[in-house]
Amino acid sequence: MNTESMYTALGITPAVHRFGEEVLAGLRTRFDEIDRVAEYNQCKVIGAMQKNRVDATHFAATTGYGYNDAGRDNLERVYADCFHTEAALVRPQITCGTHALTVALSANLLPGDTLLSPVGAPYDTLEEVIGIRPSACSLKEYGVHYRQVDLLPDYGFDYPAIEQALRGGVKLVTIQRSKGYATRPTFSVAQIGELIAFCKRIDPNVICMVDNCYGEFVETIEPSDLGADMIVGSLIKNPGGGLAPIGGYICGRQDLVDRCAYRLSAPGLGQEVGANLGLMPAFYQGFFLAPTVTASALKGAVFAANVYERLGFRCIPNAAEPRHDIIQCVELGSPERMVAFCKGIQAAAPVDSYVDPIPWAMPGYDSEVIMAAGAFVQGSSIELSADGPIRPPYAVYFQGGLTWYHAKLGILMSLQKLVDAGLVTLEEK
């Protein structure tokens, strides 16, 4: 059996394939570590499912109001138990991660309240939600104030400035775990726990919310294990396991989640309404698969960092650093390299492989964005995908891979496109 010939048939030259195999030879220890975390988290998910006696009746579809939806309600108990929280809201009516965060913020902030980000600027799409960039129905328009404390030059937390902001009166602290389209490191759960503990020492009543997108099941603990009052994420990222076609979750304190449910539906209705529309099998099975799917994506990210760092590109995290989310940032230095990289990811896809991604003015962003994603679920970033804003330092953000072998093919194809365009040579730097 000649695997190299299969790669050749898909458009990978022997030189690029051999380069990848040389990189891969040094990653066995890293991959074993990723597998150990996945094994732990797999047991955690199975334990939560068994505790809540998941059975075939929980897969039944509901329509209309969705009253007495046993599958939906039990899934929320599974999430709450797995993430060690009092309550959970897990719904297909939450359309994306930004929507989930908007629900959580608007449900728990009233006119005159103050929102604090102690980790610098939020993800691009949240700028309009908060009102940093003007938008109708933003938190600012409803009278919610916003404060921001930037990170120190070494990306540490500016504790004196955070303390000063908190003593000025803050209702809710929002902590973005992942880097988004920034080039800072992703925070570990331990770092987030330290920040939460600090905030609670200053003001025990402050609500600490963590944007957990891209981070679920990367470590053996979650921010909710270290004091987060709410954790928020998307089901078309890690916890959906590549099977959930839509959805988001909010896990946390019962009173806070109750308010989120009222905001998502209506006061007085809360979690009692919201039909599952036949999505329960995908939601349950996706959550079951999530630890191993996340492990595949992590292997792809580690492989990408080692490939591109060897070629002289700055990678965040670098090739040796521990992982706290599934995103790999590679600073490519030019728009042409970004486009070629993304064309490679697209060409390696099982869906829309014939399409050429091009930069476009994507809603919610202040610069053109290029996105490559030959995905079964539109916008799914647990599936192999790459994207980034067309602005210096021309960094592309690679994530996902339902299987490790698809992630590997995508990275090799991205390199192949760069080599073919004369933008990269296979010489170690």
Q: What are the language-model segments listed below?
A:
Residues 3-24, 28, 35, 45-51, ...:
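Conserved PLP-enzyme active-site core in the AAT-like
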Residues 76:
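Generic structural marker for isolated residues within well-ordered, non-membrane alpha-helices
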Residues 58, 62-63, 89-92, 326-331:
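Short glycine-rich or small-residue beta-strand-to-loop segments that form or flank ligand, phosphate
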Residues 309-428:
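Conserved C-terminal alpha-helix-loop-beta "cap" of PLP-dependent enzymes
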Residues 38-42:
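Acidic, PIN/NYN-like endoribonuclease modules and their adjacent C-terminal/linker elements
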